[in-house]
Amino acid sequence: MSNLQHITIKDNRHLLAEAEIQTHPDLVDAHLRVEAGQIPPGARSLLVDAVLDVPNVPPGTRLEITLPTGDPEMLEKIRNRCHDINTRVAGTSCRLQTTFPRG
């Protein structure tokens, strides 16, 4: 059984970034997307924090994230909160594997 969640980061009702998160008993799969154009600093980090703070996911649960290739803010935020990160580039996306951090 899985659970689907949608997270959005907005500024004055304008969408800046969003994530679709599918949780399974032993895996969380998240797809992060950022709108084209100028995004205020910190919006990407807020999205990553929202994904990593999803409730009812035990620490150590496997986490797979798809994010835009070449997004240093998102990648740095994930590296600050998670350990043992593996990444691979797939076209315009980066596929990242790690585990959920401890609260």
Regions found by a protein language model. Name each.
Residues 26-37:
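Conserved acetyl-CoA binding element of GNAT-fold acetyltransferases
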Residues 40-53, 80:
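Conserved acetyl-CoA-binding loop-helix of GNAT-fold acetyltransferases
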Residues 26, 71, 92-94:
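Short acidic/glycine-enriched loop/turn segments that link adjacent beta-strands
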Residues 91-103:
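C-terminal "cap" of GNAT-fold acetyltransferases
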Residues 2-18:
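Conserved beta-hairpin
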Residues 13, 19-27, 89:
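A conserved beta-strand-loop-helix scaffold within acyl/acetyltransferase catalytic domains
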Residues 69-87:
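Conserved active-site alpha-helix within GNAT-family acetyltransferase domains
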Residues 55-67:
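Conserved GNAT acetyl-CoA-binding A-motif
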